[in-house]
């Protein structure tokens, strides 16, 4: 089972919150104190809470569930994308489009258009167009890929959202809440943990902290999928001989 230790978190700077003047009182239970005007997050809470979240994500993945990684802050985008790809899951790393979950029917049409343009770009269709028309379609393809590339193969709503930065991704969290999709989120001292089912109190800006969260969630999802494949193999009678 994937777990993260106190030492891992200390080394990644998970315990450094925001300046005290920006705090959200709803995070008080998770704050240890302040140092040089910066809130220090109590890792005695964060360690077990994150490990509980990892166990939940692993369980979802073991049942063929879909995990949607969400992190559109500049510091989070790249790590979110890499982690999701590494565990064959899905991501939104650029901008959350309002209605991405709650208006899935419309989003599905846009994904269909994205896939059409992708095949046109490789089957020679673009070459038969005028220069201007080809350029317009290329731009449309790039725009759709940027917004929807990470969810184009999701094939339906996700089973869990993993979010870096609850305040920044409040629209995504609200949409998940409306649809009853559980949310795991990293919540810093300047944010409200409202609507988050699995709160991970921690720094949501430092690259090392973000990488720790994303790689751990990817490892948990991979472990869950491995469990699922092992069960499947057993059911199919493909159990390796000792």
From Swiss-Prot:
Gene3D superfamilies: Glucose-6-phosphate isomerase like protein, domain 1 (3.40.50.10490), Helix hairpin bin (1.10.287.610)
Origin superkingdom: Bacteria
Record-level GO cellular component terms: cytosolic small ribosomal subunit
Keyword terms, alphabetized: Ribonucleoprotein, Ribosomal protein
Swiss-Prot/TrEMBL GO biological process terms: translation
Matching SUPFAM superfamilies: Ribosomal protein S2
PANTHER family xref list: 30S RIBOSOMAL PROTEIN S2 PROKARYOTIC AND ORGANELLAR, SMALL RIBOSOMAL SUBUNIT PROTEIN US2M
Annotated family: Belongs to the universal ribosomal protein uS2 family.
UniProt protein name: Small ribosomal subunit protein uS2
The organism of origin for this protein: Shewanella oneidensis (strain ATCC 700550 / JCM 31522 / CIP 106686 / LMG 19005 / NCIMB 14063 / MR-1)
Chain's gene name: rpsB
